[in-house]
Amino acid sequence: MMGRHVRAHHSSLATRLDWPFVLTGVGLWLVFAGLMATIQIASPNLPSNDDFFHIKLAQIMREQGLRPPFPWLPLTILNEQDFFDHHFFYHVLLIPFTYGDLREGAKWVGIIFPACAFLMGWIFLHGQRVPYAALWSLGFFAVSEAFINRLIMTRVQAVSLLMLLLMLHVALKGRYRWLLPLAFIYTWLYDAFPLLLTMIAIYVATRWLFDRRLNLAPLIYTGLGVGLGLVINPYFPNNVVFIYHHILPKLMDNSDINVGNEWYPYETWTVVKNSGLALLVFFAGLFALGFRERRMSLEAAVLFLITLFFGLLLFKSRRFVEYFPGFALVFGAVAWQPLLTDWLQKKPAAAKILPVLLVLVLVPAIGFNLQGAREDLRGSSSYLRYAQASAWLVEHSSPGSRVFNTDWDDFTQLFYYNTHNVYMLGLDPTYMHQYDPDLYKLWRSITRGEVSESGQTIRQVFGAEYVITDLRHDRFLNQAEVDPWLQEVYRDEDAAIFLVLAGAD
């Protein structure tokens, strides 16, 4: 009796499954992953410096627990007492990739997660009944080389894009209650939840303009999810304090601090070159909206405003190239959906012509972007850059001793190879500036070679026993050569290490 019931249940489930949809999704995911793999195999290097940090911290979480102590940046707002992992759930997702070689695991992340994001894009387009949604979804590889370069990184942006598309899909389908748990997850995933709140606010406002009836339920569910994600958090209340410190400097024009390159805007022509097809698809979508005799759909209006929002952010900061091209493609596809559907109904022969035209556009654009992404990966920093210098420090320094690094963005690779020592600053220079502005300015002056006999200051103020620097800090190296408190003890083709002599105390 029980056996017949179980068999009947499985039979019913198999009947309910839309097998063409499932098989198409599996096939598309394999294509997406395969195309991403063609980029990753172009070089053994990782696409960005931050990749080293994320995969290493995930390994530490696997070995020491989901909230391990973080002693490695004691002179920043990420000191051990105040530490907050603002990519907490992302690092949890990385844990399965930390078994075995970490570098290879990081590369698999840069294949699997973007493929999942693009699959979500296809699900979204399929849900909007876009003709040839599968071909449109291949356009994610065509619209922007910079977009691809961002998503192959072992960083949160691919999962963030997936989650934003999923939550917009849920909102457009009217399943508002799902926004609460999804917003909760997103808040644990990434501290960019203001993007989510803005996106849902755009949806609510647009629906109000269309229906003349204000329904705040989507925004309330999303806000509750974000609020609960902040409060029911393993790092509360440190997370709230950190978010204030992290976001505020980016909103202010603080030219005194050189933050990461991704926070600065592109020149207009650079956007045209690296995301020209995304801009073309966006304006083609506008043309489609103007071409229709009937009023635009709610879905098209929402996507237009969201894409415009990310476009404005892109001209403020180049890091938003991880969102604008993807949403531009989705907007263009949804904007053209009614016209294409009508055309295919009136001219059935077009069903054979249209996919051919799409392929003729996609193939060269995809090939161009893949080749560009492969070349960019080959030009990235060698994954072995600080391997030997870090090994030397592990062997010759005491556990927990401080190392004065002369470049904040070297921290990630140093951390990857050497958690034996702790460092001055890393990930973002504002983390030390927010902790102690004067200390940051002193660190910067030393690294620029503006402080004579800096070894004494490095020992007394920063408490460091060693200094590690790349070989491009010429002015610092010139000062170090004549500094009686610094003794060079190691050098290779990438780095030099100095011992801070005990007499500097």
Language-model segments: residues:
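Membrane-proximal, lumen/periplasm-facing interface regions of secretory-pathway glyco-
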Residues: 345-396, 408-412, 427-431, 444-453, ...
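Juxtamembrane membrane-water interface segments that cap and precede transmembrane helices
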Residues: 71-75, 85-96, 241-276
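Membrane-interface transmembrane helices that cradle and orient dolichyl/undecaprenyl
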Residues: 164-178, 286-295
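Transmembrane-helix motifs of polytopic, lipid-linked glycan transferases
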Residues: 108-129
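Active-site lumenal/periplasmic loops and adjacent helix-entry segments of GT-C-fold
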Residues: 37-115
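Short periplasmic/luminal acceptor-recognition loop of GT-C membrane glycosyltransferases, typified by
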Residues: 395-437, 460, 464-472, 498
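Membrane-interface alpha helices of multi-pass inner-membrane proteins
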Residues: 144-147, 165-170, 177-192, 200, ...
